[in-house]
Amino acid sequence: MEIKPIAYFSAPFKSKFGVPRQSGVVKGLRGKIRFEEEYVKEEALRGLEDFEYVWLIWEFSMNERGNSLAVRPPRLGGNEKVGVFASRSPFRPNRLGLSCVKLLSVDSEKGVLEVSGADLADHTPIYDIKPYVAYCDAHPDAKCGFVDDKEWKLFDVIPSCLEIDRKLADTFSHEEIDALFEVLAQDPRPQYHKKSNPSRSYGLLFYDKDVKFHVEDDTVVIDDIL
């Protein structure tokens, strides 16, 4: 079977650094799905506006194909290995991702969906979209392996000074600032950096800006916006 993208994703992230590790964890993060020309037809999207969430099947296009059958999930601190099929690792044999996102609007005429809570970088190819159906998709009492035993701690996020606070307000909308803070609260650093170089400075490409930050204990400090 050969498959080709039906759409591409527009997101604030121009690189994979900072992209949320799971869909739904940064609920304020908005993006747009732009369909390829052959699917910009009312009949293709008819009825989709009646659903609140959709599933996206997409490609980890910024990652190489994974060759290892065991991976180190961030949830386990990068110390323990599990099988690749027992993880959400982006380094997979077929590089396919699966995400559930909230559907905010449907523009059938332009072939654009606006969604929130996605974990996709900009220009990610999307291969299929399916509606989320609660009666068969939701399993709130399901056990979730190592995820049940490892709570993900959110960090505090602060500007380094009043000047940076003002710069944030001048650069981004209130909605974008909220989303940025949600992203940084997830601590986007690679696991191995947290031990080898905890005071290192980082740059997060968010929209068309480079957000500089470092981490002090459990706090992300925004140092500049370039």
Label the model's feature ranges:
Residues 14, 106-113:
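Short, conserved beta-turn/loop elements at beta-strand boundaries and strand-helix junctions
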Residues 111-133:
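Short solvent-exposed strand/turn elements
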Residues 48-54, 153-210, 214-226:
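Basic, Lys/Arg-enriched alpha-helical interface segments
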Residues 44, 48-97, 192-198:
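Active-site-adjacent substructure of cysteine-protease-like catalytic cores
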Residues 1-5, 91-100, 207:
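Short coil-to-beta-strand transition motifs
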Residues 1-42, 48-50, 134-183:
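Arg/Lys-rich, positively charged N-terminal/basic patches that mediate binding to nucleic acids
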Residues 8, 99-104, 114, 125:
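Residues located in well-ordered beta-strands
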